[in-house]
Design a protein with these regions (language model features):
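Loop-to-helix entry region at the N-terminal start of transmembrane alpha-helices
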Residues: 30-41, 92-96, 164-186, 221-222, ...
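Single transmembrane alpha-helix segments in multi-pass membrane proteins
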Residues: 32-77, 110, 114-125, 263-269
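Transmembrane alpha-helical segments in multi-pass inner-membrane proteins
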Residues: 93-94, 98, 225-237, 241-303
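Helix-loop-helix "hairpin" substructures at the membrane interface of multi-pass membrane proteins
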Residues: 168-245, 274
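Cytosolic-side transmembrane-helix boundaries in multi-pass membrane proteins
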Residues: 125, 129, 144, 148-149, ...
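Conserved hydrophobic register position within alpha-solenoid helical repeats
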Residues: 9-16
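Pore- or pathway-lining transmembrane helices of multi-pass membrane proteins that form conduits
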Residues: 65-69, 119-142, 249-262, 278, ...
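Alpha-helical transmembrane segments within multi-pass membrane transporters and channels
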Residues: 87-133, 140, 274-279, 310-311
């Protein structure tokens, strides 16, 4: 039965506007969720860089390859489970996390001891050396595993999703956010509650004073680089669940990682957290209007303008410097 009564049309129009308004609100909250998800990925990729860059002042262009090594470690672990324990495949990620940390951490220590320790105070040479190392690692992985994407599967508890108040939430993104927070809190505990963390904070604030107090800055540098690289390897485990595992995986995140670290404040983990989540949400809100590429460009421009006004980032570390 159709009716042209004005009150019916008015009621229908009002109902349509209400529904459209509700859908618009849900879409905005969906963008926030996507932004937090992207921010957690950026945080995982950047948090290790925040440690090494903050303590050592080293621009490590091979940081993305530590992420890539973590992803390939996950692939190898899953292949071993498929071959020898297919019934326990859901445990593969739990095994891959410490394995990726050890592999990437060991490579990081080797890079610091073998190359970077001879280049402190020479930022251009360090940048070029680490860029060369990144190319070597990419080619080594490409030679061993091939140039094509590798199949890394999600365990059963990370498949599927659910709807909450109209929001579409996938389990893999949800688990990555939870995992990111756990890694972040674990790193805070290491920095605040351990002897190594105390020494790292001392070297970050004033390297010369720390050395004069008997802290072995060379040892701290090696352990810091290993810790930062290990955390990047853990990030690779998470990224293997949402991105293609290829030799170029790390290159997709290295620029964003530096952007997060510089925007948040070098060496400040809380600044890195807020920076990553903020940039992730901003990116997802800009994408519907500007597109994915232009959104990244706009964010880069905004960060550059912000750094010009506040060169030390959102949260600058406090410390006393000794002038030469």
């Amino acid at each position: 039965v159709q009716s042209d009564a004005p009150e019916v049309r008015t009621a229908a129009q009002s109902a349509i506007e209400t529904i459209e308004g509700r859908l618009a609100v849900i879409a905005q909250f969906q963008n926030v969720w996507y932004g937090l998800s992207l921010g957690s990925v950026l945080l995982l990729a950047a948090i290790g860089l925040a440690i090494t860059f903050g303590v050592m002042g080293v621009i490590n262009m091979a940081h993305g390859e530590m992420v890539m090594l973590g992803a390939y470690t996950t692939f190898v672990i899953q292949e071993l489970f498929r071959a020898f324990a297919p019934g326990m495949f859901d445990l593969s990620l739990l095994v891959a996390i410490p394995a990726a940390f050890l592999v990437a951490g060991a490579v990081g220590v080797a890079i610091e001891r073998g190359v970077i320790q001879f280049l402190y105070g020479r930022p251009l040479e360090t940048l070029l050396a680490t860029w060369g190392i990144s190319l070597i690692l990419q080619q080594a992985v490409r030679t061993i595993f091939g140039p094509t994407n590798q199949d890394v599967s999600a365990p059963s508890y990370m498949q599927g999703g659910f709807e909450f108040l109209g929001l579409a939430i996938t389990y893999n993104r949800l688990w990555i956010i939870v995992f990111t927070l756990v890694v972040f809190l674990a790193l805070l505990a290491v920095l605040k509650l351990t002897s190594l963390g105390l020494q790292m904070r001392a070297v970050t604030q004033n390297r010369r004073m720390a050395a004069s107090m008997g802290i072995r800055t060379g040892y701290v540098d090696a352990m810091t680089f290993g810790l930062g690289s290990g955390v990047a390897g853990i990030a690779g485990v998470a990224l293997s669940q949402i991105d293609n595992v290829s030799p170029n995986l790390g290159q997709n995140y290295i620029i964003d990682s530096f952007l997060v670290v510089v925007f948040g404040g070098v060496g400040n983990l809380w600044g890195t957290l807020i920076s990553a989540l903020s940039l992730g949400v901003m990116n997802k809100f800009l994408e519907p209007y500007a597109g994915a590429v232009l959104a990244k460009i706009l964010i880069l421009v905004l960060v550059i303008l912000f750094i010009q006004k506040r060169p030390r980032g959102l949260f600058a570390l406090k410390g006393r410097a000794v002038e030469a």
